[in-house]
Amino acid sequence: MQRRDFIRNASLALAAFGLPSLPACAASKSGQMGLRRLGQPQPFDFATLKGQARALAQAPYKSHKRVLPGRLEGLDWDQYQSIGYRQDHALWADQPGKFQAKFFHLGLYFHSPVRMFDVVDGKAQELAYDGAAFNYGKSGIKDGELPADLGFAGFRLNTRKDTDRDFAAFLGASYFRAVGKEGQYGQSARGLAIDTGMGKPEEFPDFIAYYLEQPSADSETIVVYGLLDSPSVAGAYRFAITNGDVLLMDIDSALYPRKAIERLGIAPCTSMYQVGENDRRMAWDWRPEIHDTDGLSLWTGAGEWIWRPLLNPRNLRFNMFVDRNPRGFGLLQRDRNFDHYQDDGVFYEKRPCLWVEPKGEWGEGSVQLVEIPTVDETFDNIVAFWNPKEKPQPGQELLVGYRLYWGAEPPARPPLAHCVASRTGLGGVVGKKREYFSWRFAVDFEGGELARLIDKGEVEAVVEASRGRVEIVSARPLREINGYRAMFDLVPPEGSTEQIDIRLFLRSGGKTLTETWLYQYTPPPAGAPERTLY
């Protein structure tokens, strides 16, 4: 599987598929400040965009990637980051509404021009690229050096009260991200994932055009439309984005496959996990923990709540959680303690959770989790998405709706106690010689009824393992969090390095008290340091 090689294939000429194609000289005069408009406004709505996507799917796929002109092709990270969009060219900056949009320049990883349209009163008009709209900083690029029809890489949204801080950004392939009140970017979402974690190159669809609908003066929501294209599928997306303490994206999509898709990923979440409390395989850094998110949360169609801590595995790891009509899932950052990260530059403790809430019934399928080894926090190595059981076929229309919530807390939480920490280490009894290898797990739960049961001592830990032996099981009050700590040792089969699946929950008198904690443990090979400590 390819990692980080996801920025590919953006739009060039789409006139044959329903988008107007106009030369720069056809730019129309506009009373609005900022970018010029091209041609005359054309009627536009979501049905129009679906028609464009359907037409794309009926034609052979053509790559949208291009070689960038001049110095753009060789920019490094610092040079690209120094290119900024000028406030006096921001879209809607002169309008009475609360929001405005700014645009990203092509360069670095972003080689695919994306067409931008302004939608006013149900009519769309393309926005013309203008080099004068950018400050080129340390890039070495001079105003007027680049072609007049270069195009954009993406866009960002902010409020007119805070023109320097984004609350959402769409940039690269079909990637987009947003923030809650903490104002810190972290994980990303994608329009679609195709063949992720299959041991072959992943396909990364591109948003090749965006239509930004001008909001009314008192609107709290901004609507964005995206046209998606890839070798396997074309699609139309509608995003209704409501900024707030928890940012909401209400999404409707229509997909039109060009060919059968082996593994289709709906509502994909993309994150990074390098080092955490439970997995210290890559703990070479001075910081105790390094991750955008620390676990996958699932609310199944049957009503069960599941928490699966993330891992940075030695080899690519793929898991599927079979379900029917899931109620929600997401990659969460539950650990909000700065002391656990000690990074005052990127603030991992402020990074948003991303919760997916299906609209309607999604039927049979599975939430799939892909974990990829990484040695660097700049590599996104975690992907979670919904994979429908029925594989979409060419000629079909697949309609999918869902909501994305970005913020410190997801909108849905277990009524039971939830896991707040998962720690692991060498097993055995302190002060006694270890006769065999074992690995210890300490899992902390808080919430629900646990605080009421602290003084009653009626809580037990229920642990199951797919192989090996579980021993020294306990559930003890943890007054510091008004909760409980479950502990147990796992003894793998002698000489085995085969993966072991573990399931844990707390109960009292036959009543379940916590969400279900799932884990995958791989015993170390013979000669590994942890096997020599007994």
Curated annotation (Swiss-Prot):
**One Pfam short name:** MdoG
Post-translationally, this protein is described as follows, namely: Predicted to be exported by the Tat system. The position of the signal peptide cleavage has not been experimentally proven.
Location of this chain's protein in the cell: Periplasm
GO annotation terms (biological process): beta-glucan biosynthetic process
Its chief place of residence is periplasm
Q: Which Gene3D superfamilies match?
A: 2.70.98.10, Immunoglobulins
Which PANTHER family does the entry mention?
GLUCANS BIOSYNTHESIS PROTEIN, GLUCANS BIOSYNTHESIS PROTEIN D
The name on file for this protein is Glucans biosynthesis protein D
Question: What is the scientific name of the source organism?
Answer: Stenotrophomonas maltophilia (strain R551-3)
State the taxonomy lineage.
Answer: Bacteria, Pseudomonadati, Pseudomonadota, Gammaproteobacteria, Lysobacterales
